[in-house]
């Protein structure tokens, strides 16, 4: 089960635009894994072919947290079903915990599990712009966006 940032809305069009892979809304996850997180992070940055196409994270980092255990932080923009778990599996990592720490402009921060908060005015403004534009034209991280080449394996 994934935990962390979850956006709730009654706007079906906005929900579709925010979650559809073609919108390329960036999401950041921290996966606590067993395996070689350092090697996996290097491999992930080169791209990993899954059954539904190439996964190319925009950012990856790994931090050892114990013997054979790592926190691997990944930022992805595709948002395909179980993409992070499938990516980790393809890299021979066993996922123990998966936390979505950021979804577009919304950061988890110090919000405790099971707690909720309203979006800030700025988050609402950015989400409105993203859903109006279809997501691709607005980089929610404020930095440079890495170009990705998508290949379908069909």
How would you name each of these model-derived features?
Residues 1-154:
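Basic, flexible Lys/Arg- and Gly-enriched helix-loop patches that mediate nucleic-acid binding at interfaces
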